[in-house]
UniProtKB/Swiss-Prot annotation:
The gene is LAZY3. It comes from Arabidopsis thaliana. One of its GO terms (biological process) is gravitropism. Involved in the regulation of root gravitropism. Functions redundantly with LAZY2 and LAZY4 in the control of root gravitropism. Functions redundantly with LAZY1, LAZY2 and LAZY4 to control plant architecture by coupling gravity sensing to the formation of auxin gradients. A motif (IGT motif) lies at residues 44-50. This is Protein LAZY 3. Keywords: Growth regulation.
C-alpha cells in the first residue's frame, strides 16, 4: 500500500504530511559534507539515491506550455507504433481471442518453393561458380615453381656430367 500512496503522491505532486508531532523530531547523526549540499527533503530522493522530480519544476512547466502550444491531436493509446503493441491489445489477444498469438513468419519464403535443402544447394553452386570464375592463382604459381625447379635440376645434372672424365681421351696412345 505504501507503494501506491508513493506513486499517487508523485503523480499529484503533493508533499507528504508527516503523521508525527513536530515536537518529537528524531535526532539524526551529523551529515557529511557531500550530503549537506543536497536538499534534505524526503520527496526529492527516490530509491537508489537519485533526485526526484521536485527539483526542476520550472522546466516541467515550460515543457508543458510548449507541448500545449503545438496543434497536435491527442493520440489514441490503443494505436500501435512500429512493433510496440498496447497492453490492452495484448490482453485482449491473449484472453479473449481463441486463436491466441500468430506464430512468427518463417525465414524462408515457402511460396517460391524454397526449402532448407534448396538454399544449401544454391549456396554450394554459387561458391563453385564463384571459384570457377575467379580461380585462385596458387595453381599457376605452383606450376611455375615446379618448371623452374626442373630447369635448375637439369642444369645441375648437366654441370655434373660436364666434369666427368671421359675415357676416350685416355685410350689414345702415343707411339
Amino acid at each position: 500500500m505504501k507503494i501506491f500512496s508513493w506513486v499517487q503522491r508523485k503523480l499529484s505532486g503533493k508533499k507528504r504530511v508527516p503523521t508525527s508531532d513536530s515536537s518529537q523530531e528524531p535526532s539524526s547523526p551529523p551529515l557529511s559534507k557531500e550530503v549537506q549540499g543536497l536538499p534534505q527533503d524526503e520527496e526529492t530522493f527516490l530509491a537508489i539515491g537519485t533526485l526526484g522530480n521536485n527539483i526542476f519544476p520550472k522546466q516541467e512547466e515550460e515543457e508543458e506550455e510548449t507541448d500545449s502550444s503545438k496543434d497536435i491531436t491527442p493520440v489514441n493509446t490503443d494505436v500501435t507504433i512500429g512493433k510496440k503493441k498496447s497492453l490492452s491489445f495484448l490482453l485482449k489477444k491473449m484472453f479473449v481471442c481463441t486463436s491466441g498469438f500468430k506464430t512468427p513468419p518463417p525465414l524462408l519464403d515457402l511460396s517460391r518453393g524454397d526449402s532448407l535443402h534448396n538454399t544449401r544447394m544454391e549456396k554450394m553452386l554459387r561458391t563453385i561458380l564463384n571459384k570457377k570464375i575467379h580461380p585462385q592463382r596458387s595453381n599457376s604459381i605452383a606450376k611455375k615453381y615446379l618448371e623452374s625447379n626442373h630447369k635448375i635440376m637439369d642444369e645441375a645434372r648437366s654441370s655434373v656430367d660436364a666434369n666427368k672424365w671421359v675415357k676416350t681421351d685416355s685410350e689414345c696412345e702415343i707411339f
